[in-house]
Curated annotation (Swiss-Prot):
This is Probable transcriptional regulatory protein CYA_2259. InterPro entries: Integrase-like_N, TACO1_YebC-like_2nd/3rd_dom, TACO1_YebC_N, Transcrip_reg_TACO1-like, Transcrip_reg_TACO1-like_dom3, YebC-like. One of its GO terms (biological process) is regulation of DNA-templated transcription. GO terms for molecular function: DNA binding. GO terms for cellular component: cytosol. Transmembrane segments: none annotated. Its main location: cytoplasm. Belongs to the TACO1 family. It is found in: Cytoplasm. It comes from Synechococcus sp. (strain JA-3-3Ab).
Length: 249
C-alpha cells in the first residue's frame, strides 16, 4: 500500500493548485451536498458532513460556497441536478485493481469518461464486484504535526484504533470504519491535528509494479481518473518503489 499512499500524499500536496482550477471545489461541494442530503444539515450533528466541511475549509473553499452546498443538500436551495453515488471497478496496466467512487447527475456521462480513462492506458472497466473483493473498508484518520509517535500509538489504542503508520511528522491511523467518528473525536480531544477523517478502501493484496513504463501508465490512469469532476476517490492496489514513484511524479 506504500506506493498508493505515496501517490495519495502527492495528490494532497497538489490540492490547492487543483482548487484554483475549480476541479477540487466541484468535488468538495458535491461531497457536502450528498452528506447534508443523507443526514442532518448540521455539521455538529452529522460527522460525514462535518468531515466534508473541514476538508473544504482546509482547501480554502469560501464560507459562502460551503453554506450554499449545505443548503442544496438540505433542500433549502434550488438544485435541479440530483446527485447519486456510484462505484466503478476495473483493471489498470499490469493487472492493478482500481476502485472508483463517483458522485454524478448523469450515469451515462460518468461511465463513458471513466471507461475512456481506462482504455487510453490499456486498462478495462469491469463489472460491479470484479475488484472490490480485493479491498476492505477502513476508517482512516490523517494527522499532521506528530512529534511523539510512541505517545500517539498509546492514544490510538485508547481510542479504539487498529493500526498506525508514521512518516516524518505525518501519520495515518486505521480503525474499523464504524468507529471512525469515535477515534477521530478522541484524537482531536487529545490535541492531535486531524487533517482528514474518511472511510477508505484499503487493498488486501498488492501488485508490485517494477517496470517504469507500466508504472508510468498506472500513475497516468490514476491522474486521469482523479481529474474527472464526477470522481470523488480513486483506490488501487499497486506498490511502486518510492524512488521510481518520485522520478515519475
Amino acid at each position: 500500500m506504500a506506493g498508493h499512499s505515496k501517490w495519495a500524499n502527492i495528490k494532497r500536496q497538489k490540492a490547492r493548485v487543483d482548487a484554483k482550477k475549480g476541479s477540487l471545489f466541484t468535488k468538495l461541494s458535491r461531497a457536502i451536498i450528498v452528506a447534508a442530503r443523507n443526514g442532518l444539515p448540521d455539521p455538529d450533528a452529522n460527522f460525514r458532513l462535518r468531515s466534508a466541511v473541514e476538508k473544504a475549509k482546509a482547501a480554502g473553499m469560501p464560507a459562502e460556497t460551503i453554506e450554499r452546498a449545505i443548503a442544496k443538500g438540505s433542500g433549502n436551495w434550488a438544485d435541479d441536478s440530483p446527485l447519486e453515488e456510484i462505484r466503478y471497478e476495473g483493471y489498470g496496466p499490469g493487472g492493478v485493481a482500481v476502485l472508483i467512487e463517483a458522485m454524478t447527475d448523469n450515469r451515462n456521462r460518468t461511465a463513458a469518461e471513466v471507461r475512456e480513462a481506462f482504455s487510453k492506458v490499456g486498462g478495462s472497466l469491469g463489472e460491479s464486484g470484479c475488484v472490490s473483493w480485493l479491498f476492505r473498508q477502513k476508517g482512516v484518520i490523517s494527522l499532521e504535526g506528530v512529534t511523539d509517535p510512541e505517545a500517539l500509538l498509546l492514544a490510538v489504542a485508547e481510542a479504539g484504533g487498529e493500526d498506525l503508520k508514521v512518516e516524518g511528522t505525518d501519520a495515518e491511523v486505521y480503525c474499523d470504519y464504524t468507529l471512525l467518528e469515535q477515534v477521530a473525536t478522541y484524537l482531536k480531544k487529545e490535541g492531535y491535528q486531524v487533517q482528514e477523517a474518511a472511510i477508505r478502501w484499503i487493498p488486501s493484496t498488492e501488485v508490485h509494479v517494477e517496470d517504469p513504463e507500466t508504472a508510468k501508465l498506472v500513475l497516468t490512469l490514476m491522474e486521469r481518473l482523479d481529474h474527472l469532476d464526477d470522481v470523488q476517490n480513486v483506490y488501487a492496489n499497486f506498490e511502486i518503489d518510492e524512488a521510481l514513484m518520485e522520478s515519475l511524479a
